[in-house]
Amino acid sequence: MEIKSIKKLKLYGFNNLTKTLSFNMYDICYAKTPEHRKAYIEYIDEEYNSERLTNILIEVANIIGANILNIAKQDYDPQGASVTMLISEGKVEQDVENGQGNGNAIGSATDCDNGDGKAGEDCALLIPNAVAAHLDKSHITVHTYPESHPDKGISTFRADIDVSTCGMISPLKALNYLINSFSSDIVIADYRVRGFTRDVSGKKYFIDHKINSIQNYIAKETRELYQMIDVNVYQDNIFHTKMLLKEFDLDNYLFGTAKKELLPGEKKKIKQRLKKEMYEIFSGRNIPKV
């Protein structure tokens, strides 16, 4: 979706506005036995390992038109993964042979693709000046948190994503791609704009585009799938949207067990547990037993 600017601004110097889009994405399931819970954690840990997360972030950089400076990734034991990517708005000139450059960028996002959709070795390249330069650059990060409860049979997977940019590039362009990449049951999205930029007359601008809700930038077909609630603080350029998947098919939430294998009473109890878990995460508070 097009990011509509307030009006055409002639800026004095660099656009110093920092725009940050943050997600907490949740996948919920019911795993009946300890073996099923262990298998779910192993499955989700492999499904969203650091390599796949890296490829998702490379595509995000492509979508928003950013250049990749550096990628750091890590898979954790016993579970979880993290990827951090430093990006910049413009291509940073470098001289690899002499080790010179003003930031030493790897290059555009496409430079990190081997041609098979996977991140190449050059994405791990960190030329000396890059670390010192990153404070005035933008970044994309993702961290995953698989977990399960031994008594209730509920297992959850959470992915935290931050896309922070400065300059003219906007993280909102990657909004729909990120939502679709994780196919989550619950999405908590935050968008904020910080700092200011000036026009040539010296007037400060604290935001440079039109927005009254994150929902403005979510595709119609996605909006139709989710129940959504907004909490926005317009005067502070803070926008918050919660999303809960409308459709509930028990089969989609069972891991290692089919719905037909359960007794009617079991189905009802499991459905109640799952819905309670989802509403608690969606609302951000525990729901007492009635």
Swiss-Prot record:
Name of this chain's protein: S-adenosylmethionine decarboxylase proenzyme
One example of a Gene Ontology biological process annotation: spermidine biosynthetic process
EC class: lyase
UniProt subunit comment: Heterooctamer of four alpha and four beta chains arranged as a tetramer of alpha/beta heterodimers.
Role description: Catalyzes the decarboxylation of S-adenosylmethionine to S-adenosylmethioninamine (dcAdoMet), the propylamine donor required for the synthesis of the polyamines spermine and spermidine from the diamine putrescine.
Free-text comment on the cofactor: Binds 1 pyruvoyl group covalently per subunit.
The family this protein is said to belong to: Belongs to the prokaryotic AdoMetDC family. Type 2 subfamily.
Pathway(s) the chain acts in: Amine and polyamine biosynthesis; S-adenosylmethioninamine biosynthesis; S-adenosylmethioninamine from S-adenosyl-L-methionine: step 1/1
GO cellular component, one term: cytosol
Catalytic activity: S-adenosyl-L-methionine + H(+) = S-adenosyl 3-(methylsulfanyl)propylamine + CO2
NCBIfam families in the record: SAM_DCase_Eco (TIGR03331)
EC number: 4.1.1.50
PTM annotation, UniProt: Is synthesized initially as an inactive proenzyme. Formation of the active enzyme involves a self-maturation process in which the active site pyruvoyl group is generated from an internal serine residue via an autocatalytic post-translational modification. Two non-identical subunits are generated from the proenzyme in this reaction, and the pyruvate is formed at the N-terminus of the alpha chain, which is derived from the carboxyl end of the proenzyme.
SUPFAM superfamilies attached to this UniProt entry: S-adenosylmethionine decarboxylase (SSF56276)
Organism of origin: Heliobacterium modesticaldum (strain ATCC 51547 / Ice1)
InterPro entries, A to Z: AdoMetDC_fam_prok (IPR003826), S-AdoMet_deCO2ase_bac (IPR009165), S-AdoMet_deCO2ase_core (IPR016067)
Gene name of this polypeptide: speD
Keywords: Autocatalytic cleavage, Decarboxylase, Lyase, Polyamine biosynthesis, Pyruvate, S-adenosyl-L-methionine, Schiff base, Spermidine biosynthesis, Zymogen
MF terms (GO), sorted A to Z: adenosylmethionine decarboxylase activity
Domain of life: Bacteria
